[in-house]
Amino acid sequence: IALMIMFTVFNAFSAFAPTFNTLFIARLLSGLPHGAFFGVGSVVASRIAEKGKAAQAVSLMFMGLTIANIVGVPLGTFIGHNFSWRISFAVVVFVGLVTLLSLKLWLPALEATKNRDLKAELSFFKKREAWLIIAITSFGFGGLFCWISYIAPLLTDISKFSSEDVPYILILAGLGMVVGNFIGGKLADKFSPAKTVIYILLTMALDLVAVYYLSSIQVVSLTLVFLTGAISFAAVAPIQMLMINTAVGAEMIASAAIQAAFNIGNALGAFLGGLPLVAGFSFASPNLVGTGMALSGVVLVFIFIQYRKKVVKLQAIQTT
């Protein structure tokens, strides 16, 4: 609730900002709660979920993000273009107030974690498992950002769509993200978060190879836009649950760290994916880099699983 208050208040400042500098600062401040909100939200969703459905609960929470991308972004653009950018922010403030009221009315009271302070939670990052999961997220899912960072020129230069078609095609990616997010939660509950992440990253690698070789065929390209969006967001709930299950006693801060790891992956994917373009290769080439990043994530998950087994075995010996 506190994070939503911050989000709503700072967006209100944006709506009434008298100068560009004020608007810039207000936008910066309104973005601060983002990672913490989804980190805390993931933990809360997993705690209030039915037994065996924690990952599905997390995926439902993130489904709001995917739906917002499909509906909110074009709606905000439409309002800003036809009316005023200030009204766009006013709508965001209204949605924030509705969300606050909803949280107050329907979010159940959860018992706070006892005997934990910030120092104790930060100690989780002394563990190798924490950094392995962050690396899995940053490198493995950096493959997604190799694709999405250069999707517009891929669609226009390789698939030969017009630039006017691109915004509508991206709706397909958004729809795929909604579907994939839901499927990923079910898979993580059925199997395990670690195994699910492996399956998704392997599928992502194959998908990006297909994007590289087949995007010149328009019908196939459209299909791959949907599939790539679905595959990429199928990973969100499993990787969150992998971190939550590993960071016992430090779930909140560890879950928020995943959001930072995704942002690192965003930067890495855009940078590494751009290198072949600088070297003169086609706009399909970033997807081969993305394939390599996805496969590197698979290797890191296997390393995590083996290391985790050793830790659990050692803990079992110490308690006997």
Language-model regions: role of each:
Residues 6, 10-13, 21-30, 219-227:
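Paired small-residue
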Residues 93-112, 300-305:
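C-terminal membrane-cytosol helix-exit motif in multi-pass small-molecule transporters
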Residues 1-12, 195-209:
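Structural signature of the two symmetry-related core transmembrane helices
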